[in-house]
């Protein structure tokens, strides 16, 4: 049996500790390398939403995104063609990997420019949304497309061209579906926006909810005054005595609020093309129907809304 003096034993122990630590660091290094590879995996594999921007060439939109489902970037180009007067967009054409695929007429939509969005729920489900805007930035065209490999065409899976939908752009996407921002300017409250979820089923998008607590006032964004501070908090000051109702479409009174009091916008319900807003006053909740055609501007519901209406 080998015998060691104290110095030799100390050296052996130190060397053993060094080798053990080196092995630990090697294992840790391998783990970190593998982890880095995981997080550096191309984003094409993940659900995502992004803009396809307009290039320096006016009327052309270019993006490199996965359309065909192979998790590699495809070249997508949307080219617009103006009308004879040069005011509106007459049509747009979609090119995929250098090949012309689909042409859509915008002759009846009075669009000045486009917004192009890309949304990916999964490898199998990728979409292009094209939004056309006209006067006062109103949405006049809005459709979502997916690519069909067999026909080499982009086909519509959701049309928001019914203006009573109030839909604008896709804001999120995941394996379950998409979330779409909506926006409208009721005369009673001014501009508000909200989001609603859609699921993808049988090759089309279906809205899965009619109510949301995401509704927000936009009136506090452009001015700096005391009313802007209220609007930024979703609060409205009554301009007269206002009656709120217990349910949507109901005539049963929940409560009445005197002039000059603050109520808080809490919820939106969209039912049968009608918009109802839920407000909170103290500990009470009540509803108003808004966006009515016969609104009386001379007797507004809320203070300082009329002066902020656009269009």
Language-model features: locations:
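Bacterial N-terminal signal peptides that target proteins for export
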Residues: 20-31
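Bacterial N-terminal signal peptides
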Residues: 29-40
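Short aromatic loop motif centered on NTY/YTY
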Residues: 112-147, 153-232
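Short, Lys/Arg-enriched N-terminal segments with co-localized hydrophobic residues
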Residues: 2-19
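Sec-dependent signal peptide cleavage junction
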Residues: 38-51
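Beta-loop motif signature
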Residues: 220-276, 280-286, 291-311
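Structural core positions within WD40/WD-like beta-propeller blades
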Residues: 74-78, 129
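Residues in Ca2+-coordinating acidic/glycine-rich loops
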Residues: 65-73, 119-125
């Amino acid at each position: 049996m080998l015998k060691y003096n104290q110095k030799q034993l100390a050296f052996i122990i130190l060397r053993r500790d060094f080798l053990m630590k080196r092995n630990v660091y090697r294992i840790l290094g391998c783990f970190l390398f593998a982890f880095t590879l995981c997080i550096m995996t191309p984003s094409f594999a993940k659900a995502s939403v992004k803009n396809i921007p307009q290039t320096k060439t006016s009327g052309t939109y270019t993006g490199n995104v996965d359309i065909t489902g192979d998790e590699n970037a495809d070249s997508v180009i949307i080219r617009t063609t103006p009308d004879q007067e040069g005011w509106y967009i007459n049509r747009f054409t979609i090119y995929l990997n250098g090949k012309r695929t689909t042409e859509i007429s915008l002759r009846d939509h009075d669009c000045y420019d486009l917004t192009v969005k890309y949304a990916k729920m999964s490898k199998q489900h990728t979409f292009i949304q094209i939004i056309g805007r006209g006067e006062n930035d109103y949405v006049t065209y809005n459709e979502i497309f997916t690519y069909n490999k067999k026909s080499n065409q982009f086909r519509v899976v959701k049309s928001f061209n019914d203006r009573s939908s109030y839909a604008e752009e896709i804001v999120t996407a995941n394996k379950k579906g998409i979330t779409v921002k909506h926006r409208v300017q009721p005369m009673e409250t001014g501009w508000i926006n909200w989001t609603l979820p859609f699921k993808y089923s049988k090759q089309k998008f279906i809205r899965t909810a009619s109510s949301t607590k995401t509704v927000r006032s936009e009136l506090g964004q452009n001015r700096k005054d005391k009313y802007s501070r209220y609007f930024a908090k979703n609060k409205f000051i009554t301009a007269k005595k206002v009656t709120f109702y217990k349910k949507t479409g109901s005539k049963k009174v929940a409560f009445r609020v005197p002039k000059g009091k603050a109520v808080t916008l809490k919820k939106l319900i969209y039912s049968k093309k009608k918009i109802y807003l839920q407000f909170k006053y103290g500990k009470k909740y009540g509803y108003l129907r808004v966006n009515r055609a016969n609104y009386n501007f001379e007797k507004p519901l809320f203070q300082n809304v009329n002066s902020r209406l656009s269009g």
